């Protein structure tokens, strides 16, 4: 039965398709709009879709007549099925739209409800958490307050014990972290130092085959001083130089600083080297430049000497000074060449010579380091002074020709300058953990404290005389010319020229203070000076010199004795031949401009005879006095 029904349905559909094809399936009359006004409930079947007619198929306006719609029975099955399908599709679309609209409204209302409920639930939950948390803290605070109020001493003890326990725990943790590394690395460091840190230099020895000589002679400007141990035994030497910053400094070998005392043979004073502040220190180059405490030059009775930096050292003869049986001896030496960052020197040295300076005339070249341990090296080495702008060299560039016969190349000089600059910057950035450097502890030294107290309590008269001499005498700084570098082996280094004003500024005005302690000491010392007493003494000395009668100088070419007689107002005419030249007071002289070089002027005459007079005397008629005689004109006799 089911199979028969299926076959009947297929036959019915095939018949419909055949009928539609025969009736003109693609005819324009069967192109429906897809809309209908038929209502299923009214039973009006005449409301079939209106076919679309093309413009050529429309009847003319004259033949239009109202015709009733054909009955449905005249339609084909295809048209009926098509109309039914369109109706069903439209009804389904309408029902679907209404269903979707109702579902959307329901979903939107449900979403709003769920959202409101969720927000309320979250708010209630958060406030519950806040209340519980705050309640816990409030309860805990009340309990702690009650506990501290009731058991104050016990609570304090517990807090201290807790802090101590925490510190012990942190210390144990840190120790457990670093102790294995320390135990592992310490033997490696010891092995490394023993294997690769062998010394390449020894401090002193005599050069084989070099025959030197020694003569008794004092160092230039007493610039070489002895370094001693704390017990007074000999240690080495140090040299005083004048820096371009205007300060005086000590230069010595770096290995001579530990436990050393700077000792003066003139004054007998001793100053520990720990009170000196290093402005340059290099263990690799074995040289140190140190600035001392206030008035250390006066305590040691030394003056700053000139020096030559590494970029200007040339080959040639040199000398160095040592102390033998309480007397200074000058020994010969020869600058031979370069040895790595040092200078090779041919000289005979012995134990205790370290730190002594090598001199070319009055210029310091460097300090003695020792001698290299290589087999082929038969000479000593000298540590040179690096060129540090503003400290050991000026900040400007010399406009001169290139230096001839230099020992170091440009690359070696630049390397020395770079190392010196890094060392100075490292010392400037150094700050102790206790905010107090080792150079600030010179007040705690008993020997130096007694020496400084004795120097401070010196007679005020000596200070007044020194100040008055500086006030009355003309400034000699303008009369001094810049010292040039002395020739070495016939080859001279370039010299800095001055224009009358010293290029080296005064230490009190240009040199920056070492630290606040030194500045306070200087301020206290200046505050102790009695300026009123000094001014009175200066005025008294100047007035005494102004009231003194100038002495008449003898003429070397005229002969005879010049007598200065006081004449009455009606004196006779003068027969001296020239008006008297009054001598200016000593304090009225002015400093003249200094020459730009130390070489003799081309117009200067050789020594051996006196220069002629700087003026030519001329005769003038003396005015007639009220009761005097008329002058007789006479000509001077030519000498």
Swiss-Prot record:
GO terms for cellular component: membrane. Specific enzymatic cleavages in vivo yield mature proteins. The protease probably cleaves itself and releases the VPg protein. The VPg protein is probably further cleaved in its C-terminus. Residues 587-602 have a biased composition (Low complexity). Changing residue 255 to L: Complete loss of viral genomic or subgenomic RNA production. Residues 1-20 form the signal peptide. PROSITE patterns: PEPTIDASE_S39. Keywords: Hydrolase, Membrane, Protease, RNA-binding, Serine protease, Signal, Transmembrane, Transmembrane helix. The chain crosses the membrane at residues 121-141, 144-164, 172-192. Residues 455-515, 539-639 are annotated as: Disordered. Its EC number is 3.4.21.-. The keyword Protein biosynthesis does not apply. It comes from the Viruses. The record marks 204-205, 399-400 as: Cleavage. Residues 207-399 form the Peptidase S39 domain. Residues 463-488, 566-577 have a biased composition (Polar residues). One of its GO terms (biological process) is proteolysis. Residues 548-561 have a biased composition (Basic residues). The active site is at residues 255, 286, 354. One of its GO terms (molecular function) is serine-type endopeptidase activity. The C-terminus part of protein P1 and VPg/P1-C25 displays RNA-binding properties. Belongs to the peptidase S39B family. Precursor from which the VPg molecule is probably released at the onset of the RNA synthesis. Essential for virus replication. Participates, together with the proteins P0 and P7, in the inhibition of the induction of aphid-induced host phytohormones. This could play a role in the attraction to the infected plants by aphids. This is Protein P1. It comes from Potato leafroll virus (strain Potato/Scotland/strain 1/1984) (PLrV).
